[in-house]
Amino acid sequence: RVSSFMKDFETEAYKLGILLQTRHNEVAPNQFECAPVFCEATKAIDQNMMLMIIMQKVAEKHHLKVIFHEKPFDGVNGSGKHCNWSITTDTGVNLLSPGKTPTKNLQFLSFYSSVLRAVHRHHYLLMASVATLSNSYRLGGNEAPPAVMSVFSGSTLYGVFQTIMNMKDVKESVDSRQESIKIVNSIPEIFPDNTDRNRTSPFAFTGNRFEFRAVGSSQNVATAVCVVNSIVAESLREFRAYVDALEAAGEDRSSAV
């Protein structure tokens, strides 16, 4: 019955131009997941709300009920939304996509560090954007993710930033299979880890985007996206002002960045 219902609402979604790429069960009994294909933020937000309406209407035809409450049953896993967020240029270049050698990819590191700064400075705003009453029954002590905002970067990126912060020379040697990365004279050999491994992080980097995992299942994601856009925009503006000041003082751009 559930499979038939999901196929039907997927068909209705396709008719409205909403593309879906995932269909599988989740941890709780009769809990299932679908994932719209990514697109521009405003369009993705509209499609997300339209999809919720479609699911409710199609469920009635199948004599089912879709529950969007974040924690409808005590002691059973609740529901949420994973908001995948990245930033691209007008020509489609993903500014959060690392190169083959992340320590040399100045553009990636600049934008990545600006996002980290934004989350560090405005973590209370991020939490406020998802702090509904029903979602509070899910976050924190009840189940992952925790209510405390943090970013999981993976050991490779963490090591790169630690090295830069310590003002040591960053050298790297990547073999043809990219099986290991060495940053000489700073940290030991590390194996590339899956940045998606830590499923408890509420704001995790997953290869070429950040995944905000604390959004409630009944929420309009517009608030969360608006907050992320705003705090990152502020961080980038201040980053640009800082670099411009160093350039005005005589430093070249690469050194200033």
What residues fall within each predicted segment?
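Glycine-rich, acidic/polar active-site loops that bind/position phosphate-bearing ligands
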Residues: 1-68, 73-257
